[in-house]
UniProtKB/Swiss-Prot annotation:
Annotated compartments: Cytoplasm, Cytosol
Gene Ontology CC terms, in alphabetical order: cytoplasm; cytosol; eukaryotic translation initiation factor 2B complex; nucleus
Subunit-structure text: Component of the translation initiation factor 2B (eIF2B) complex which is a heterodecamer of two sets of five different subunits: alpha, beta, gamma, delta and epsilon. Subunits alpha, beta and delta comprise a regulatory subcomplex and subunits epsilon and gamma comprise a catalytic subcomplex. Within the complex, the hexameric regulatory complex resides at the center, with the two heterodimeric catalytic subcomplexes bound on opposite sides.
Record PTM text: Phosphorylated at Ser-544 by DYRK2; this is required for subsequent phosphorylation by GSK3B. Phosphorylated on serine and threonine residues by GSK3B; phosphorylation inhibits its function.
GO MF, one example: guanyl-nucleotide exchange factor activity
SUPFAM superfamilies, per the entry: ARM repeat, Nucleotide-diphospho-sugar transferases, Trimeric LpxA-like enzymes
Gene of this entry: EIF2B5
Residue numbers carrying Phosphoserine: S27, S130, S450, S466, S469, S532, S540, S544, S717
Protein name, per record: Translation initiation factor eIF2B subunit epsilon
Modified residues (Phosphothreonine): T322
Organism of provenance: Homo sapiens
CDD domains named in the record: eIF-2B_epsilon_N, LbH_eIF2B_epsilon, W2_eIF2B_epsilon
Function: Acts as a component of the translation initiation factor 2B (eIF2B) complex, which catalyzes the exchange of GDP for GTP on eukaryotic initiation factor 2 (eIF2) gamma subunit. Its guanine nucleotide exchange factor activity is repressed when bound to eIF2 complex phosphorylated on the alpha subunit, thereby limiting the amount of methionyl-initiator methionine tRNA available to the ribosome and consequently global translation is repressed.
Length: 721
């Protein structure tokens, strides 16, 4: 295909745009008009088929999260169907944990057929440890050529993002690529079942432009701290919203991948959003949001969300992604739909007297015994249910066997699990693959049974995302350690991971992992709430470090530039190091520019003796400015940035009056290197609210001649226009 050939030039252009805002049409007016008339490039997507956490352990020890069946369809198939329906023509699927299983599934699916409208490209690596690693690899491989969608492989959605994409592209066109991301949200009341507690956010947004001004995870907080500057700007109005569900769908510009490369401390999307909002002035980048009211979007981040989203699919809230649609074109997943949302696959057998009350999906080849009662449940293909069984809000995967007299409430049974006679599973129980429990036993609420011993987790830190991590050791432990009949029954096979009767710390871990956070607001103490609120304040805008931190930062920048000069380090790497120092010491952009300007302007003084000589100073400084000009251009973007840099330059020459006559040459160098613009230099020079020393500095003859030359050049340019 031609796409890989086009990719490198596209990336080069996007990097240039980050600085200048110039389009690919070049400087000619005809080229620009031609570029405007061209259709938008094919839409691409980056699908991250890994969560980089253990939220679904021990379930995901047997299969990756994106292959977990929801309403008998793998999660990743929902995500790919959403991307294809919304117009994506090329999707890069990044896999780490159990990548071989994901690759095998995709290669057998319709997504890898020659007729697929969405070309799926699978990229695997055991080195990915976060979303940040994935996006840095996207940038290194130059995979994206224009705006792209960023999603996880467990997103379920029917949102048509066409309007959001058009708004995103229009903003970037009008504001010269300032907006780098548009986040998709869905209106949803705080009590809605699909609201995931750990994903709850408070968002402050410009009501006119939908620009995100503040983004904060609530995490059970009762109070929130907002920077006062949010409400003091020139915006027409600011909305503070708590009625939004984060769909985990983002429209990204190519700059997003580049920003992850430039800021290696960004590991998650939240890191990225927080970094850009707290330090928005770094590159002048902005984040916007798009809110949908009627469409559906959610991420299956824990079993609470799994249950809620599965129920929504069965109740047809995600239309057209319904069970009978069979959008995967699989012969084993076809089914019929009847009243009360009863879905039956082929070759299903239902015994005499059994009742399917409502919202029930029966997979192909499933056999139901007599006098059973089933409601709000999903039963996978090839399952066998005995007589007199009660299933309420239960999810059975492929090949599960439930013997007579069993009662299962709000629980999950994975592939080939088996429940013996007269077993009761209390709510929020989980049996992972091939576990056997019973007979004649009641599992307490919150029980999690797995064939993997829980103590095998303690020694897995070094290889937590490796497919073979600890596999041999687990097998040895299984051989040495028998099953406890008190936990799993006389004929049971499995180990108890968590149970409601265990200590509070383990219960909290269960809630945070499999079923998600459960916040009891009344029990939260006032001091804890205030402490949590205060902990957010360092991320607020306007916070400045202590003076000694600035001094340390200045010394670190000086050391970085010295090494850069001695070792010939590229400017891109110098920017990376300065950015990491900026975050380490919580330095604002204004302070970065002040320190950078001060350090560079003082750099030649290390090689000079007193008294200072202007000619010698310029001879030493100008080559440094030329070499490090990309570093300056990385931070000096907007008019306000130019004025801050000019103020720092003025402060230096006020401090070193003996070098005052050099200022004109220095400003000329900044101008010729396209670091400072002529209009901002003229604006700075004409400032009237300066000190007496500042006014005296402006009377320097060389400086006045330079300013006069700039004015004449500006007038000539205006006449030519």
């Amino acid at each position: 295909m031609a796409a890989p050939v086009v990719a490198p030039p596209g990336v080069v252009v996007s990097r240039a745009n980050k600085r200048s805002g110039a389009g690919p049409g070049g400087s000619g007016g005809g080229g620009a008009r031609g570029a405007e008339e061209e259709p938008p490039p094919p839409l691409q997507a980056v699908l991250v088929a890994d969560s980089f956490d253990r939220r679904f352990f021990p379930i995901s020890k047997d299969q990756p999260r994106v292959l977990l069946p929801l309403a008998n369809v793998a999660l990743i198939d929902y995500t790919l169907e959403f991307l294809t329906a919304t117009g994506v023509q090329e999707t890069f699927v990044f896999c780490c944990w159990k990548a071989a299983q994901i690759k095998e599934h995709l290669l057998k699916s319709k997504w890898c057929r020659p007729t697929s409208l969405n070309v799926v490209r699978i990229i695997t690596s055991e080195l990915y440890r976060s979303l940040g690693d994935v996006l840095r690899d996207v940038d290194a491989k130059a995979l994206v050529r224009s705006d792209f969608l960023l999603v996880y492989g467990d997103v379920i959605s029917n949102i048509n993002i066409t309007r959001a994409l058009e708004e995103h592209r229009l903003r970037r066109k009008l504001e010269k690529n300032v907006s780098v991301m548009t986040m998709i949200f869905k209106e949803s009341s705080p009590s809605h079942p699909t609201r995931c507690h750990e994903d709850n956010v408070v968002v402050a947004v410009d009501s006119t432009t939908n620009r995100v001004l503040h983004f904060q995870k609530t995490q059970g907080l009762r109070r929130f701290a907002f920077p006062l500057s949010l409400f003091q700007g020139s915006s027409d109005g600011v909305e503070v919203r708590y009625d939004l569900l984060d769909c985990h769908i983002s429209i990204c510009s190519p700059q997003v991948a580049q920003l992850f490369t430039d800021n290696f401390d960004y590991q998650t999307r939240d890191d990225f959003v927080r970094g850009l909002l707290v330090n928005e002035e770094i590159l002048g980048n902005q984040i916007h949001m798009h809110v949908t009211a009627k469409e559906y979007g959610a991420r299956v981040s824990n079993l609470h969300m799994y249950s809620a989203v599965c129920a929504d699919v069965i109740r047809r809230w995600v239309y057209p992604l319904t069970p009978e649609a069979n959008f995967t074109d699989s012969t084993t997943q076809s089914c019929t739909h009847s009243r009360h949302n009863i879905y039956r696959g082929p070759e299903v057998s239902l015994g005499h007297g059994s009742i399917l009350e409502e919202n029930v999906l029966l997979g192909s080849g499933t056999v139901i015994g007599s006098n059973c009662f089933i409601t709000n449940s999903v039963i996978g293909p090839g399952c066998h249910i005995g007589d007199n069984v009660v299933l309420d809000q239960t999810y059975l995967w492929q090949g599960v066997r439930v013997a007579a007299g069993a009662q299962i409430h709000q629980s999950l049974l994975c592939d080939n699990a088996e429940v013996k006679e007269r077993v009761t599973l209390k709510p929020r129980s989980v049996l992972t693959s091939q576990v056997v429990v019973g007979p004649n036993i009641t599992l307490p609420e919150g029980s999690v049974i797995s064939l993997h011993p829980p103590d095998a987790e303690e020694d897995e830190d070094d290889g937590e995302f490796s497919d073979d991590s600890g596999a041999d050791q687990e097998k040895d432990k299984v051989k040495m350690k028998g099953y406890n009949p008190a936990e799993v029954g006389a004929a049971g096979k499995g180990y108890l991971w968590k149970a409601a009767g265990m200590n509070m710390e383990e219960e909290e871990e269960l809630q945070q992992n499999l079923w998600g956070l459960k916040i009891n607001m009344e029990e939260e103490s006032e001091s804890e709430s205030e402490q949590s609120m205060d902990s957010e304040e360092p991320d607020s805008r306007g916070g400045s470090p202590q003076m000694d931190d600035i001094k340390v930062f200045q010394n670190e920048v000086l050391g970085t530039l010295q090494r850069g000069k001695e070792e010939n380090i590229s400017c891109d790497n110098l920017v990376l190091e300065i950015n990491s120092l900026k975050y380490a010491y919580n330095i604002s952009l204004k302070e970065v520019m002040q320190v950078l300007s001060h350090v560079v302007l003082e750099f030649p003084l290390q090689q000079m003796d007193s008294p200072l000589d202007s000619s010698r100073y310029c001879a030493l400084l100008l080559p440094l400015l030329k070499a490090w000009s990309p570093v300056f251009r990385n931070y000096i973007k907007r008019a306000a940035d130019h004025l801050e840099a000019l103020a720092a330059i003025e402060d230096f020459f006020l401090e070193h009056e003996a070098l005052g006559i050099s200022m004109a040459k220095v400003l000329m160098a900044f101008y010729q290197l396209e670091i400072l613009a002529e209009e901002t230099i003229l604006s700075w020079f004409s400032q009237r609210d300066t000190t007496d020393k500042g006014q005296q500095l402006r009377k320097n003859q060389q400086l006045q001649r330079f300013i006069q030359w700039l004015k004449e050049a500006e007038e000539e340019s205006s006449e030519d226009d």
